[in-house]
Each structure stands twice: as structure tokens, then as C-alpha cells.
Regions:
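Short, surface-exposed ligand- or partner-binding patches at beta-edge/loop junctions that are enriched
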Residues: 83
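Structural scaffold elements adjacent to functional motifs in cytosolic proteins
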Residues: 39-41
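Rhodanese-like catalytic fold shared by cysteine-dependent sulfurtransferases
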Residues: 2-29, 37, 46-79, 88-120
């Protein structure tokens, strides 16, 4: 829980500009080690099936019902750790979810995750 406190403590310093926190693969791994954190893969179903972070839920950010699916399935106020392939789509998802959740985004995406940890 220490990493979450550190991350959100930093966000508090820039509350007007920071809507979510972008982290690298190592910090993301520490965040998702907390079983209370919801891990969200925002890539397509095909990308998800080809490989994903263990325990992740898949909701495609490019689908028109992304926000409705995410907000109906995740209780408000939860910490949501999300990622895409390279870090582009996840920023779109992070912006959409930040008003209702504590959002951590994997800036390097699944590509960075697999470079750091392989496809475990």
C-alpha cells in the first residue's frame, strides 16, 4: 500500500493538473500486487487473447460503450490500474475514468511490460 500512498500523495501536489498517474512497468507491478486494485486492459479482445497481464479485465476503450461498461462493473472510488499496447489508448481510458476512480496508467503499455517481465 506504500506505493499507492506515494503515487497519490504526488497527485495531491498537482491536483489541478494531474487527473491520473502514469508509471513504468516496475511501479505498475507494485500497484497491481494489491488485490484491491482493478487491473484493466483497454486493448481489443483479439489483443487481449494474444496475451495480457494476469488478472486483468478486458474492456476495449475504442468501443462506444467503454465508459458505460467500465463504470457499471467497477465500484466508484476504486483504484484502477490500466494499460493498452503502447500507452496511447490507455491515456484516453485514464482521462475517461479519472473523475470516478483513482487511476494508474502503465505508460509503456503491454510492450513495456513484456520487455520488463516477459509474458508471465
Amino acid at each position: 500500500m506504500g506505493i499507492l500512498s506515494s503515487i497519490f500523495g504526488l497527485m495531491g501536489c498537482n491536483a489541478q493538473t494531474a487527473r491520473f498517474k502514469t508509471v513504468d512497468a516496475k511501479a505498475f507491478a507494485e500497484v497491481i500486487a494489491d488485490t484491491c486494485v482493478v487491473v484493466l486492459d483497454v486493448r481489443t479482445a483479439e489483443e487481449f487473447q494474444a496475451g495480457h497481464i494476469k488478472g486483468a479485465l478486458n474492456i476495449d476503450v475504442l468501443k462506444s460503450d467503454f465508459e458505460q461498461k467500465a463504470t457499471s462493473g467497477i465500484p466508484e472510488g476504486k483504484t484502477v490500474a490500466l494499460y493498452c499496447r503502447s500507452g496511447n489508448r490507455s491515456k484516453k481510458a485514464a482521462n475517461a475514468l479519472a473523475p470516478k476512480y483513482k487511476v494508474i496508467e502503465l505508460g509503456t503499455g503491454y510492450i513495456g511490460w513484456t520487455k520488463e517481465f516477459g509474458t508471465r
